[in-house]
Amino acid sequence: MEEADKRAEELRAQIAECEATLQSLKEQLAAAEAAKTPPYSDSTETDRGSSSSTWKWPLAEAEYERYGRQLILPSVGIQGQLRLKAASVLIVGAGGLGCPASAYFAGAGVGTIGLVDGDTVEASNLHRQVAHGTSRVGMLKVDSAISYLRELNPLVKYNAHQSHLTPENAESIVSGYDLVLDCTDHPTSRYLISDVCVLLRKPLVSASALRTDGQLIVLNTPAAPQADLSGGPCYRCVFPKPPPPDAVTSCGEGGILGPVVGVMGVLQALEGIRLLAAGRHLSPSPEQQQTAISPSLLLFSAPPDGSPAGFRSVRMRGRRKDCFACGEKSALSLATLREGGLDYVQFCGGSRKPVALLKSEERVSAEQLNALLQQQAGEHGKPVLLDVREREHFEIANIPGAINIPFSKTQNPGARHNAEDTPKLDWLPDGVADGHSPVYVVCRVGNDSQTVARQLKEFGLDNQGKRFIGDVKGGMLAWKREVDSTLPFM
């Protein structure tokens, strides 16, 4: 068996090496093909057999062939294509949104595409982040995405910004681009990106996706100066206050359906291409002042019950007079940003802090729980293990004997009292409320379990301290680390 495992490992290593070599050859081929393409110039020289003549058309021959299907659209045409070619787009985030968005910008022939991301590719990314591949796991996302984009279209210039966007580097990075896409997944980055776009007068296309829902909005278009209320609203105009930290759910916690985030990323590219082809990113002459398009928030939902997926548009107001970033009395400045005068983490409520609702003696480690479960029933009976993860997590993997009670069900106020207003937890299994067996609560990482354990105590299930009720420190993540390393953890 060990010999077979060793051989399998050797084969995997050889496959990875061959895939890396193949990827390198593909990139060399793309570079060679790009080198033979007539350069971007109105006076490109092209060889026709043994003779040469002056190329008199505004695009190179390869570009007419590549972009022909969109060139014949009234909304693009030759002028629109020339605007796309001359334009530059910055995509902040090379993940589920940034991958499809960057692919369609590259396919459309946008002249320069910049990618900002400091993360590396993980296997858990691959079901939705379509520019990455198995052979590039561990590679910086911007490098992985650009290798994919170069193969898609070698005629585009690609810039890799191998770090996260911060208040200190935002100005130097964003200033070199005509349009910005917010493809991040956290409020702190969304407010930062919006603020720097206001200060540098850059249009912004922002989107988000979680579970089976998504939303998109075009901001700061037209990109008027601060205090000019004729400009498009910024992110702070739409969301003056950030959501509380506990209400922010990541893809890792809430899940995401790949095509949903793909739809939103493609829509970001669509809005960006429309904006660039129409020249709405360009500063108009005085007689051609742009008028702000009535902003709207586009909502997408693919209901899990199988009903038809669809879109809904919600009209939004324009710029707010009292907006901190773009309003009439805004004090926001590039100097403040450069000097770190704005703490976006603090503004958004800080990092989510570990929950500390129970005393240390009310908590057990995963190893301790495992030992307790292996023992014979004590004088108070066999321990009761309540797993308060949502059903989908529980069904993937669970501890044998655990009873699943989804946390969302435990927080339903209507289920806490019976008709006579006597304290009762209707979601508890029969026999648990009136029994004497110790109760252990486990969740994903040890936060929700504390909430439920305290709730059980508040309703008197601990028999005035005679019955143990507590939780498992670190939750199922600790169980994987300390007890069962094979447990699939989501």
From Swiss-Prot:
Region (Disordered) residue spans: 33-54
Molecular functions (GO terms): AMPylase activity; ATP binding; identical protein binding; metal ion binding; molybdopterin-synthase adenylyltransferase activity; molybdopterin-synthase sulfurtransferase activity; thiosulfate-cyanide sulfurtransferase activity; URM1 activating enzyme activity
Descriptive protein name: Adenylyltransferase and sulfurtransferase uba4
Active site: 251 (glycyl thioester intermediate), 443 (cysteine persulfide intermediate)
Listed Pfam families: Rhodanese (PF00581), ThiF (PF00899)
Entry GO CC: cytosol
Keyword annotations: ATP-binding, Cytoplasm, Metal-binding, Molybdenum cofactor biosynthesis, Multifunctional enzyme, Nucleotide-binding, Nucleotidyltransferase, Transferase, tRNA processing, Ubl conjugation pathway, Zinc
Source organism of the structure: Pyricularia oryzae (strain 70-15 / ATCC MYA-4617 / FGSC 8958)
Gene it is expressed from: UBA4
Biological process, per Gene Ontology: cell budding; cellular response to oxidative stress; invasive growth in response to glucose limitation; Mo-molybdopterin cofactor biosynthetic process; protein urmylation; regulation of pseudohyphal growth; tRNA wobble position uridine thiolation
Residues at which Zn(2+) binds: 234, 237, 323, 326
Co-factor note (free text): Binds 1 zinc ion per subunit.
